[in-house]
């Protein structure tokens, strides 16, 4: 399924200045220990989650209460996670191109400090223009506003990144920046424009946080077809990221949830990425993964998770960040597929997939990554979603 079509149906643009509520004083960024000795070693496995706050989703940036967040972090740490991917709702943080909200920056600092206390590292996702089926666009941008080439947009983006780096730098539990949440689903561009912007953003982020690991967390489309960023440029990054969902990629068209197109999707996409890199010897990060099959019960989701990660480990995937930590509260309007994706329920119960995640993290975290030694196929010659799927099915030796 094309997520842009989903967004067009289910989303309404949320933009404009956000009134600041009274904020707690920012916690001092205490020097905290990183999650483990693994650090940024891409040759050792790590397990984390995409954090979804149990209370008020990411609207919590505007209705700040550290109590529920602390409970969330305790529960996530108890599952054996060592890192979280955080979503900064862009218009909440930067409602004006020349101003970033200090109150929201203080809340980010608090969150980073609370995570550090629990030995959880942070990947901070910056330009979150869409998330879970909703658009979040700042008042100075629309989908057609030249996100990648407009000089005024570039100035606003640079201000935001610089302000974030200032807040993040004192904390020692920082992984780095993720450019945004699947930027290609929100802002499209010809490949040369997307690649040039990506190169400049990597340069800026490396200057500001030179010890960080910075990534571009696109969805599957740039890997499956020509879309905004070239697969070759993405694969040349220090740590290519893939977002893998049987539902969104269309894997469920080629078999059931436990058939190879779904349970070996992570493994297949890692091979696809390496085919564009031209070598088996590169680390790959599963930055988001789940089935997004809303009719799959907990037991089935847990079984899929176990099989998918084992297959990905065999194919040399380095880090795993599950989508997501907590189910979404039904008091909010979301597409039904979004409500039950957590390892924990909204009230904190550990689900069956949460227990499997805990077992996988205990078994593999810190273990050395073994890259595959099989010959690497050439990239798909047909750069369409269907053409890429035929390439994957051939690699899987699966006939739908």
Q: Which sequence ranges carry the predicted segments?
A:
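N-terminal export signals
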Residues: 5-25
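Aromatic-rich peripheral "rim/lid" segments of glycoside hydrolase catalytic domains that contact
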Residues: 60, 323-400
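Short acidic/His/Gly/Ser-rich catalytic and metal-binding motifs that mark active-site loops
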Residues: 131-139, 248-252, 329-334
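Active-site mouth of glycoside hydrolases
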Residues: 35-237
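C-terminal segment of N-terminal export signals and the immediately downstream linker at the start
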Residues: 20-37
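Glycoside hydrolase catalytic-domain groove-lining segments
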Residues: 212-293
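Substrate-binding cleft of secreted/luminal carbohydrate-active enzymes
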Residues: 289, 294-339, 357
